[in-house]
């Protein structure tokens, strides 16, 4: 299975029928967030063992049919193990879907949200492709395309929301 903190509650707030905030409340665990990877520096060689372990874990998550609808470095916790290596846990679990199998397209669309840091995303996509014995260039290109399409959609949604919530002059 996939490790997750034990859930206690889910809290969602809506405004005009639109989800504003969503909170997953779990028991405390001492693991740390991977959110520091948003500032990923490809020259920091010390991060590569963690990244390689993360990618192997992401392959395992996808192999088990888990599709986290908000898969990003802020929703993954990690712990360095004394015997060397790392363990990972997913949080924000109310945003998960489960399938019998994930296609490559679903996997790459899921990975597009892992980070908007292109260097980090490209490294993750490259290692992911290598572990699945796929063409790394093709996987990186598809993954970056899905990221750009996702960001364009998010931008359009923000602009539309801004227009809809803006008061109409009388």
Enumerate the language-model features and the residues they cover:
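Conserved ATP-binding subdomain of kinase catalytic cores across diverse folds
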Residues: 1-34, 53-64, 68, 161, ...
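Proline- and acidic/polar-enriched loop/turn elements at helix boundaries
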Residues: 9-10, 73, 83, 141
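AlphaC helix of the protein kinase catalytic domain
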Residues: 34-43
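Conserved short alpha-helix within the protein kinase catalytic core
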Residues: 44, 48-55
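Hydrophobic residue at the +6 position relative to the catalytic HRD Asp in the kinase catalytic loop
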Residues: 71-78
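Activation-loop N-terminal segment of eukaryotic-like protein kinases
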Residues: 78-85
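C-lobe/activation-segment region of protein kinase-like
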Residues: 86-165
């Amino acid at each position: 299975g996939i490790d997750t903190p034990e859930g206690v509650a889910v809290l969602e707030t809506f405004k005009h029928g639109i989800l504003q905030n969503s909170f997953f409340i779990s028991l405390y665990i001492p693991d740390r967030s991977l959110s520091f990877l948003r500032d990923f520096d490809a020259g920091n060689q010390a991060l590569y063992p963690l990244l390689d372990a993360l990618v192997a874990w992401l392959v395992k998550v996808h192999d088990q049919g888990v599709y986290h609808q908000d898969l990003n470095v802020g929703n993954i916790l990690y712990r360095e193990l004394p015997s060397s290596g790392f363990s990972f846990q997913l949080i924000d679990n109310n945003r998960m879907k489960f399938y019998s199998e994930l296609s490559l397209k679903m996997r790459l669309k899921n990975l597009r949200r892992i980070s908007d840091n292109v260097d980090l995303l490209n490294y993750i996509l490259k290692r992911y492709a290598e572990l699945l014995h796929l063409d790394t260039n093709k996987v990186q290109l598809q993954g970056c395309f899905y990221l750009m399409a996702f960001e364009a959609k998010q931008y359009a949604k923000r602009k539309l929301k801004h227009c809809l919530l803006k008061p109409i002059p009388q």
